[in-house]
């Protein structure tokens, strides 16, 4: 490993020179995956060298400032407001009653924090409306969501004591509206839909979910952390006809990550609310100490200014034309990959992805090795029997792609799948990936190889 030979976690007695420090950092990075070469299909979103250079310059220019107090750094307050307003416009604020003036929101450190805040706001809304507990305070609020909804909602459930009611998706991997409606009761404060869901890249039936939530008198959050900065531009291109934003009646909040398809620096996300009344429930304020007013819009107190500045810069640098171009390039690359997968014997795409995220692996209808646990995994997968086998072992395919071309895909289950978040940086190498995939799929099928490592990992605690 690259870290071998380095001192064991000790502060050096004598400081090192800048060149030595930077050299050691580069040595440590030698085992990192090659995202610059388009080999990584998760975690990183690249709009090219020019954008990356801009992000580095703007983040460095604001490396010392602290967004904890924008009275000291009003530029940060202004940039945050501008990002929120631009995002609201992209997500339909200009087309709803009340217009952009009614849509309020905040920046967070990323999608997880945005989902935490949306859940916390829903819990507090339930309390303010006396929707739970009947005044006794003993009932536990709950949220209803599909098994495909992001894992961060489980963290929110744990942090804020909101019961998570996970409902199996249908065979198409989309939220089952009727089953979710059956799970709502007097203690429900939130219904969740995804645009798209991370695991299979499908957009949930948001109009139906939102209408159902509105009819039952509960809030509806759309998790567009993944799609918020690409779906609007695919819509402009006529490549997506789904309705999922604030133009859908009943949608009460939306989250969108600027550091994903907005191509900003990690980490900056936006969470928006349909009304000022809802938005006011998110921040925390107190004077109950000796240091004066303490206020924060999200979980953190100190917030780094670099991602805010870089996010603001990339929005204005790319503009609508730039985002439309990147969206089209990304969509074409994703469609090329999907077509290649579907043309290869023994492989299949999971569901019918709507945009630029997809999951694939061994075709369960082709016969052969067992590729997934299906509904046996505690009912977490989907309605229906997906336990058939495939001549191509999905994780052996992933191993072969890594060995042949250094390609990295997240592995997920159930069902066993390789996950591909296709972004603009992949457009130049998608042909190379398809060639390698074509070669190794045949080899894995012919040899009948099966991966020993069956682990699946989305995030680590290191």
Language-model features, listed with the residues they occupy:
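PLP-dependent enzyme catalytic core of the Aspartate aminotransferase-like
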Residues: 372, 421-462
């Amino acid at each position: 490993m690259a870290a071998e030979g380095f001192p064991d976690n000790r502060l050096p007695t004598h400081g090192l020179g800048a060149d030595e420090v930077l050299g050691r950092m580069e040595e440590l990075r030698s085992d990192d995956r090659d995202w610059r070469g388009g080999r990584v299909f998760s975690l990183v979103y690249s709009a090219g060298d020019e954008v990356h250079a801009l992000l580095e310059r703007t983040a460095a220019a604001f490396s010392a400032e602290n967004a904890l107090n924008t009275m000291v750094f009003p530029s940060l307050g202004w940039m945050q407001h501008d990002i929120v307003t631009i995002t609201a416009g992209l997500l339909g604020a200009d087309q709803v009653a009340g217009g952009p003036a009614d849509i309020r929101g905040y920046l967070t450190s990323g999608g997880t924090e945005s989902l935490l805040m949306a859940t916390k706001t829903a819990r507090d809304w339930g309390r303010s409306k006396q929707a739970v507990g009947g005044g006794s305070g003993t009932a536990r609020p709950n949220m209803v969501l599909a098994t495909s909804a992001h894992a961060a909602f489980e963290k929110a459930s744990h942090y804020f004591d909101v019961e998570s009611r996970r409902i199996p998706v249908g065979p198409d991997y989309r939220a089952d509206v009727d089953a979710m409606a059956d799970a709502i009761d007097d203690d429900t404060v939130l219904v969740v839909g995804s645009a798209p869901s991370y695991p299979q890249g499908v957009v949930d039936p948001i109009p139906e979910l939102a209408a159902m939530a509105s009819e039952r008198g509960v809030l509806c959050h759309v998790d567009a952390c993944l799609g918020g900065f690409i779906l609007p531009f695919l819509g402009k291109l006529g490549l997506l006809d789904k309705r999922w934003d604030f133009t859908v009646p009943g949608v009460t909040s939306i989250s969108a990550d600027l550091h994903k398809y907005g191509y900003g620096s990690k980490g900056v996300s936006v969470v928006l609310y349909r009304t000022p009344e809802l938005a006011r429930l998110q921040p925390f304020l107190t004077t109950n100490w000796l240091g004066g007013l303490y206020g924060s819009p999200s979980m953190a107190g100190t917030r780094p200014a670099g991602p805010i500045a870089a996010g603001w810069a990339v929005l204005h640098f790319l503009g609508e034309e730039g985002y439309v171009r990147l969206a089209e390039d990304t969509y074409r690359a994703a469609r090329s990959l999907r077509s290649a997968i579907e043309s290869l014997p023994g492989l299949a795409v999971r569901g019918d992805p709507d945009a630029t995220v997809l999951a694939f692996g061994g075709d369960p209808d082709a016969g052969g090795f067992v590729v997934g646990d299906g509904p046996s995994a505690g009912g977490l997968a989907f309605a229906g029997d997906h336990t058939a086998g495939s001549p191509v072992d999905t994780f052996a395919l992933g191993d072969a792609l890594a060995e042949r071309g250094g390609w990295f895909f997240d592995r997920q289950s159930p069902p066993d799948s390789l996950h591909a978040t296709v972004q603009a940086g992949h457009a130049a190498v998608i042909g190379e990936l398809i060639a390698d995939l074509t070669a190794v799929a045949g080899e894995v099928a012919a040899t009948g190889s099966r991966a020993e490592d069956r682990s699946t990992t989305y995030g680590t605690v290191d």
